[in-house]
């Protein structure tokens, strides 16, 4: 039988040691599970542990008498999962500790069961001391990497604390209603009939914010393309394109296809939409999203900075360029960014953005 704590530890190890995205690491594990509650628990443990990683890591360092060996990175991640349960979840302490001990066995770490038990019990006993450990470091206190804390503090000297705190808040579940299927008011009424409380977004005409998250497969009509999950800010992109019938549109850096779909929903009478992305695996996600929504576009694998690889030579009336960025603005939704992003990435990303802009201008109609 699968132990959810062990599964979550494996997911986190793939992010921390393997530098995989949390989405990809979770997909590997969740694709093999059918139980909705187990899937939800693994997601909660993985997202939560990574959200508070730099705080939990400081706590773990204080509780361990000596560092774990590199080959025991899965055990280290399991201990972080256990600490997350004790410090941030309502799981009874005895259950969190016992299940973590059992998880060590499932990770083939029978020798470490006593260590897991001792570390987690000491977390309870030494609570006041551990609060002092957290308070001694801005990285631990605000649960962000030290380099990012310094950058935010320098750039927003009056607001840096609130900016970092915002990165640790749970994000709301925001939907985009497919207006080819329902009006927003009609879908809100459908949610109301199923006792799912939600509110319309004021700044995005297709947006809905749920008062409490629910699994996407529990959303009415989700599998049939009635709605998509998309942040409210991201929904502004298609609206700002000022789309009209007969236009040729390019969505560059299009994966996973949320904005591509939004463009097609917003103006079904386009002359054509081309969606390009450099990552073959992520291009498949564009296809998957369009298939679920019953939409179609020309989807190409290619580098948007090298149009000669894929461009047909005809200019576009509108181009949406969602250029790669640091993603620091969406850390609350993607907490793995705290571990995956490095200081040197910022300069490299800025150069990439400039190259993409230079490549896109000649493709735009005068």
Which residues fall in each region the model found?
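S-adenosylmethionine
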Residues: 1-366
């Amino acid at each position: 039988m699968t132990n959810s704590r062990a599964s979550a530890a494996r997911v986190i190890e793939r992010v921390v040691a393997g530098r995989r995205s949390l989405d990809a690491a979770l997909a590997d594990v969740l694709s093999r599970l059918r139980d909705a509650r187990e899937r939800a628990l693994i997601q909660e443990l993985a997202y939560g542990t990574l959200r508070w990683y730099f705080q939990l890591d400081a706590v773990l360092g204080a509780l361990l008498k000596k560092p774990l060996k590199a080959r025991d990175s899965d055990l280290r991640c399991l201990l972080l999962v256990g600490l997350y349960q004790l410090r941030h979840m309502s799981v009874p302490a005895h259950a969190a500790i016992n299940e973590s001990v059992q998880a060590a066995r499932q990770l083939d770490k029978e020798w470490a069961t006593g260590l897991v038990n001792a570390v987690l019990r000491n977390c309870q006993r030494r609570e006041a001391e551990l609060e002092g450990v957290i308070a001694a470091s801005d990285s631990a206190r605000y649960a962000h990497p030290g380099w990012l804390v310094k950058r935010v503090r320098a750039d927003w000297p009056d607001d840096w604390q609130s900016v970092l705190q915002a990165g640790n808040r749970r994000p709301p579940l925001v939907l985009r209603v497919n207006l080819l299927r329902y009006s927003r008011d009609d879908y809100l009424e459908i949610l109301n009939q199923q006792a799912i409380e939600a509110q319309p977004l004021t700044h995005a005409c297709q947006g809905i914010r749920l008062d409490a998250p629910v699994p996407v497969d529990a959303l009415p009509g989700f599998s049939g393309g009635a709605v998509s999950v998309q942040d409210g800010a991201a929904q502004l992109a298609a609206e700002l394109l000022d789309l009209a019938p007969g236009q040729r549109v390019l969505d560059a850096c299009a994966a996973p296809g949320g904005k591509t779909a939004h463009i097609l929903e917003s103006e079904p009478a386009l002359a054509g939409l081309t969606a390009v992305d450099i990552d073959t695996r992520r291009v498949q996600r564009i296809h998957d999203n369009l298939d679920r929504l019953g939409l179609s576009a020309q989807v190409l694998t290619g580098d948007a900075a090298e149009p000669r690889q894929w461009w047909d030579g005809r200019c576009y009336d509108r181009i949406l360029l969602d250029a790669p960025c640091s993603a620091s603005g969406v850390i609350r939704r993607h907490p793995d960014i705290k571990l995956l992003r490095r200081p040197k990435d910022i300069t490299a990303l800025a150069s990439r953005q400039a190259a993409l802009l230079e490549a896109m201008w000649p493709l735009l109609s005068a």
